[in-house]
Design a protein with these regions (language model features):
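Local cysteine-cluster metal-coordination motifs and their immediate loop/turn environment
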Residues: 1, 72-73, 94-123
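FNR/FR-type flavoprotein reductase catalytic core
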Residues: 1-91
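Short gly/pro/ser/thr-enriched loop/turn and capping motifs at secondary-structure boundaries
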Residues: 22-24, 45-46, 96-100, 125
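Short microdomains enriched in Cys/His and/or Lys/Arg
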Residues: 121-132
């Protein structure tokens, strides 16, 4: 959805996808429809071997914005990269959401504004406001 929306609005998007192995990558052709797509796998079975935060593309391009989603440890690394390079970065959090109303407090995330419910006040947050 993100890529499609950006393309419809004339916004250029570069995707950097990461996974443990090539078989874990999903919808690669879908990403390629909407922007230049680079891949990294931990085992080197597709694209560059390693993590998204170590991909060579990061030294070749200047990015004005990063949007990240996935496992929290990876998003923390991406956020640190963005902060070190003064790049605006948003993370789409995937916390467990039980009620979807904020009543159960199951999805609470610590932020500079206090504890916020991901289901009602997210799921997208500026990484500079997240207290990881």
């Amino acid at each position: 959805y993100f890529g499609k929306l950006c393309k419809e609005r004339g916004i250029s998007v570069t995707f950097l996808l990461g996974a443990r192995t090539a078989s874990d990558l999903l919808e690669l052709d879908e990403f390629r429809k909407y922007g230049e797509t680079f891949v990294t796998t931990e085992d080197g079975s597709m694209g560059e071997k390693g993590y998204v935060t170590n991909h060579s593309i990061l030294s070749k391009y200047h990015f004005n914005q990063i949007s990240t989603c996935g496992p929290k440890p990876m998003m923390v690394s991406v956020a640190k990269y963005a902060q070190a390079n003064n790049i605006r970065c948003e993370a789409s959090l995937e916390n467990l959401m039980a009620c979807g109303l904020g009543a159960c407090l199951c999805c609470v995330e610590k932020t500079s504004k206090g504890n916020l419910c991901v289901c009602t006040e997210g799921p997208v947050f500026d990484v500079n406001k997240l207290l990881w």
